[in-house]
């Protein structure tokens, strides 16, 4: 298949996937513009803008190196994926406007990487010598921001630029984007612009739109007791859970990490799971953590409108599918993940279509996967729409780096895309092999195979042009993966 005719490339997002994509593209000589709705790079690791971060690097102000604000609360249950990013209203109160224009991410006070730094290696920048396996969020943010500066991505990034709409108009893409404008009376509005591009790379991540399950009674409980129920994206500090009994819904990474973070302050932490294949083992919970069954429904026991005192538990019975129930809970935290959503690509969403009924043009149905991509990267009907950063349950930085390398090789003309028929055949084979939904973008345990397939394709073209082959994972990466595997095995056998 003929490669996209590429001169102008837009990258949506300046988290790790966007910085990697833009950096590799710039290295090939392409014209790149990055749109980032925050004031600096970093994505989920974003804390404070460049000026503040650079000014405090030698100071002891690390305690404020994250966004203390909490995002606007999600709907209970969650909105449809295509509506997961409601538009800001012009001339509204500034702080709320900015919460919508550039919502705070899930970064919290004690957030650290849960994958060792050697497994987060990228080709654009090595980790500094002596970097520990585990570091605070501000260290990772600094790493991404330094990479952005060194790779010249910072120079081509439009900050505080929210992408509102991306549409194909003939042979080019039109991106509608806005920046905030503060008026004389401190009211905030948007200045909107439209810019044309040949290729759009979606690198906006999938930790934006909270997935709130439709458990019977949960919406009523939230409506009545408000701040006692929150999504993990809203979590900031463990001290807020002092002497409380906490119910956490979900058994994945965020649930385990936050449970361990609040453990020194909380009384008992109950973790409700559905025994998903992606749940982490119970032994990873802290000593005051207890795993319980899947929730059947919530039952409010009091209809009084009197506010609860801070140390008073919710007048609530939590019923489990096992027939058991639970009382005495002070707070409920939903660690239930996120919708995959691209609200600026609304015409490619089809909220009412089932996974199985998605046609060959739809990108998003129920928010659990992106349809119709070749190698989780190229939109098969139109490869001028590209995605970097979709795989999960993996070692994100390294995988996204290889994706970005492939994109740069294709868009620069070094590597040819397969025909549309060949890409469609590969996609259909993957659907048959792994299934639809959440599992589709998981490459848990198969990272090496995924990267091998990408590099076999790329290096075949490079060899034909007598170009040096692109190398895969380093020996250090393999050593770190084996060490992590042994550590997890020991945890399972506890």
UniProtKB/Swiss-Prot annotation:
Pathway: Mycotoxin biosynthesis. Keywords: FAD, Flavoprotein, Glycoprotein, Monooxygenase, NADP, Oxidoreductase, Signal. Its EC number is 1.8.-.-. GO terms for molecular function: flavin adenine dinucleotide binding; N,N-dimethylaniline monooxygenase activity; NADP binding. Pfam families: FMO-like (PF00743), NAD_binding_8 (PF13450). Coiled coil: none annotated. It comes from the Eukaryota. The keyword Flavoprotein applies. Residues 73-93 are annotated as: Disordered. Disruption phenotype: Impairs the production of ustiloxin B but accumulates intermediates such as ustiloxin F and C. The keyword Zinc-finger does not apply. NADP(+) binds at residues 250-255. FAD binds at residues 13-18. Residues 1-21 form the signal peptide. Glycans are attached at residue 459. Flavin-containing monooxygenase; part of the gene cluster that mediates the biosynthesis of the secondary metabolite ustiloxin B, an antimitotic tetrapeptide. First, ustA is processed by the subtilisin-like endoprotease Kex2 that is outside the ustiloxin B gene cluster, at the C-terminal side of Arg-Lys, after transfer to Golgi apparatus through the endoplasmic reticulum (ER). Cleavage by KEX2 generates 16 peptides YAIG-I to YAIG-XVI. PANTHER family: DIMETHYLANILINE MONOOXYGENASE. Belongs to the FMO family. This is Flavin-containing monooxygenase ustF2.
């Amino acid at each position: 298949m003929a490669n996209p005719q590429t001169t102008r490339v837009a990258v949506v997002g300046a988290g790790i996937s966007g910085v990697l994509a833009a950096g590799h593209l710039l290295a090939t000589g392409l014209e790149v513009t990055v749109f980032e709705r925050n004031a600096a790079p970093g994505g989920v690791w974003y804390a404070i803008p460049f000026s503040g971060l650079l000014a405090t690097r030698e100071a002891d102000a690390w305690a404020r190196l994250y966004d203390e604000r909490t995002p606007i609360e999600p709907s209970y249950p969650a909105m449809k994926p295509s509506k997961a990013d409601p538009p800001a209203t012009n001339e509204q109160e500034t702080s709320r406007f900015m919460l919508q224009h550039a919502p705070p991410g899930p970064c919290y006070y004690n957030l650290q990487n849960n994958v060792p730094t050697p497994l987060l290696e990228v080709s654009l920048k090595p980790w500094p010598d002596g970097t520990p396996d585990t570091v605070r969020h501000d260290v990772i943010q600094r790493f991404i921001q330094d990479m952005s500066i060194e790779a010249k991505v910072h120079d081509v990034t439009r900050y505080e630029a929210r992408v509102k709409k991306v549409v194909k108009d003939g042979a080019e893409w039109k991106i509608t984007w806005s920046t905030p404008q503060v008026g004389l009376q401190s009211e905030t509005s948007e200045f909107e612009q439209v810019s044309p591009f040949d290729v759009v790379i979606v690198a906006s991540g999938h930790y934006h739109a909270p997935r709130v399950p439709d458990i019977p009674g949960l919406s009523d409980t939230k409506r009545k007791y408000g701040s006692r129920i929150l999504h993990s994206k809203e979590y900031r500090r463990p001290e807020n859970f002092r002497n409380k009994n906490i119910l956490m819904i979900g058994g994945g990474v965020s649930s385990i990490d936050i449970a361990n973070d609040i453990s020194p302050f909380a009384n008992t932490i109950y973790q409700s799971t559905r025994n998903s294949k992606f749940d982490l083992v119970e032994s990873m919970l802290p000593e005051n953590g207890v795993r319980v069954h899947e929730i059947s429904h919530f039952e409010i026991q009091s209809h009084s409108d009197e506010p609860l005192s801070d140390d008073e538990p919710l007048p609530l019975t939590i019923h489990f599918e096992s027939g058991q129930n639970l009382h005495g809970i002070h707070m409920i935290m939903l660690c239930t993940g996120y919708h995959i959503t691209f609200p600026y690509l609304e015409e490619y969403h089809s909220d009412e279509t089932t996974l199985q009924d998605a046609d060959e043009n739809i990108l998003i149905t129920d928010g659990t996967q992106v349809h119709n991509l070749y190698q989780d990267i190229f939109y098969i009907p139109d490869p001028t729409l590209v995605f970097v950063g979709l795989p999960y349950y993996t070692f994100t930085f390294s995988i996204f780096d290889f994706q970005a390398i492939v994109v740069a090789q294709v868009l620069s003309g070094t590597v040819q895309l397969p025909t549309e028929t060949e890409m469609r055949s590969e996609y259909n084979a993957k659907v048959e092999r792994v299934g639809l939904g959440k599992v589709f973008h998981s490459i848990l345990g198969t990272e090496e195979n995924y990267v091998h397939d990408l590099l076999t394709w790329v290096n075949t073209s490079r060899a034909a042009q007598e170009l040096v082959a692109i190398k895969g994972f380093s020996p250090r990466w393999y050593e770190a993966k084996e060490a992590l595997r042994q550590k997890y095995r020991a945890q399972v056998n506890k």
